[in-house]
Structures are given as structure tokens and as C-alpha cells.
């Protein structure tokens, strides 16, 4: 293997000092030591190692006079070479790990009676809570008169027939003209 050397020239100016002196000394020594060898000007090169069979194939394709590239041979290499048997396909498709697993964690919601997963809020009950919360937020927005005007006090929701207690003094009170839902606790 022939010795190779790469000389770098910095595009930015080097500050005067020990770094510049070392750099200039290195360049001078390299130029002196390599000046006795006759070589073409240095340029980046690409070396590719490949099997010898590819060179033989390249010589064979010259006879075809077609415009072909090495990428043409890569695409057919990735194609399947043998057909899978029906037994293998069935085993692959009907793999026990791919079958739908039976859920044993399904329970009945005690509030509404719909099916739900254990330790998860029922979807129907969640929808009721979301709708009630949306109505309360709309009422609060109408009282404030716009965004960014909310007072910095705690908000309390009172339904029909409820009165604020002594500890609720100083809180912002939102009154709803309907009966309190059973799932909406007062605390």
C-alpha cells in the first residue's frame, strides 16, 4: 500500500504564537520530506473493495450495449427466491401471539350499568361529567365577560337548594339552576 498524506490548509487566519509556529514547521518538514517523491497533486479519492465476480459481470454487460447501472442488480437481490409453503403461511397467520386476547378485566359501571374496564372511568359517565363541566365553564366565561379576567380566588359551584357555608366566604360562587347530579359531590 502506498503511503498517503493529507495536507490541510486552514481557511481562517492562525493567530501568531506557538500554534502557528508548530503548524508552519510541520508544513515545511512535510514538503521537504515528500518533495523527492514524484506524485500527482493530492486530491480526495474513493477506494471501494468488492469481490472479483463483479468485475467479470461488468465486462460481460459491455457486450449488451444497454444503459444499465449497478443499482439494477440490487433490486432483484431483495426479492424472495423461494415461495413459502401453505403450512408455513398458516402457522405464521394463526400464531397464538397474534390472536385477539380475551379480556378478563371487564366490569359493570355501578352508576349507569354500562360495561367498562376495571379501574377505569366509564366512558358514558365521563361524557356526562365533561358536558356538565363544559356548561359550568361557559357560565363562568359569561360572568367574567372574556378571557384573562378571572379573579384569583377559588371557584365554588352551587346548585338549586344549596347555600354557601361560612368557610365558603370569599370564594367566587357559580350558581346552577338545576339539581346537583348524584355523581357530582359537593366537596
From Swiss-Prot:
Post-translational modification, briefly?
Answer: MRPL32 precursor is processed by the m-AAA protease (composed of AFG3L2 and SPG7), which cleaves the N-terminal transit peptide. Cleavage by the m-AAA protease takes place prior to assembly into the large subunit, an essential step for mitochondrial ribosome (mitoribosome) assembly. Proper processing by the m-AAA protease is dependent on the zinc-binding region within the tightly folded C-terminal domain of MRPL32: zinc-dependent folding halts degradation initiated from the N-terminus and triggers the release of mature MRPL32.
GO molecular function terms attached to this record:
metal ion binding; structural constituent of ribosome
**What are the binding positions for Zn(2+) in this chain?**
109, 112, 122, 125
Q: Does the keyword Zinc apply?
A: yes
Instruction: Give the UniProt subcellular location, in the record's own words.
Output: Mitochondrion
Task: Give the UniProt keywords, A-Z.
Answer: Metal-binding, Mitochondrion, Ribonucleoprotein, Ribosomal protein, Transit peptide, Zinc
Q: List the disulfide bonds.
A: none
Q: Name one GO cellular component term.
A: cytosol
An example of a Gene Ontology BP annotation on this entry?
A: mitochondrial translation
Q: Which is an annotated Pfam family here? A: Ribosomal_L32p
Concerning InterPro entries, the annotation shows: Mitoribosomal_protein_bL32, Ribosomal_bL32, Ribosomal_zn-bd
Q: Relate the protein's function as given in its record.
A: Component of the mitochondrial large ribosomal subunit (mt-LSU). The mitochondrial ribosome (mitoribosome) is a large ribonucleoprotein complex responsible for the synthesis of proteins inside mitochondria.
Q: Which family does it belong to?
A: Belongs to the bacterial ribosomal protein bL32 family.
Subunit? Component of the mitochondrial ribosome large subunit (39S) which comprises a 16S rRNA and about 50 distinct proteins.
**What protein is this chain from?**
Large ribosomal subunit protein bL32m
Which species does this protein come from? Mus musculus (Mouse)
Q: What is the lineage of its organism?
A: Eukaryota, Metazoa, Chordata, Craniata, Vertebrata
